[in-house]
Amino acid sequence: MRKKIVAGNWKMNLNKSEADILYNDLESKTYPDDVEVIIAPASIYLDSFNNASKVSISSQDVSANNNGAFTGEFSAEMLSSINLRFAIVGHSERRTFHKETDLSLIHI
């Protein structure tokens, strides 16, 4: 049986101390075995929360590019190198503000 996923995208909210409080609260909870809880904190906090035992960590985005002059973007290889298993792809805000399309997302 596949696990149910409960995910929360923190977007560009919470300073580090606020994020720590929420993260620690989520880590202190008990979750059913058939549920995977995933959080997508701001990118600046990804590595600091990536030692979670009960909560999985996701990037809020992943670049279609493997490397190059793409300031502020993260490749799948970079995210994988810090053991991230999840990334949000095709979010409505990325589509609206960055003009991402189904076609551009196929390359990710």
What are the residue ranges of the model-derived segments?
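Short acidic/polar active-site loop segments enriched in Thr and Asp
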Residues: 85, 90
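Short, glycine-rich nucleotide/cofactor-binding loops
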Residues: 13-15, 92-93, 97
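Conserved N-terminal beta1-alpha1 strand-loop-helix module at the mouth
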Residues: 1-74, 81-84
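Glycine/threonine-rich flexible loop motifs
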Residues: 67-69, 94-101
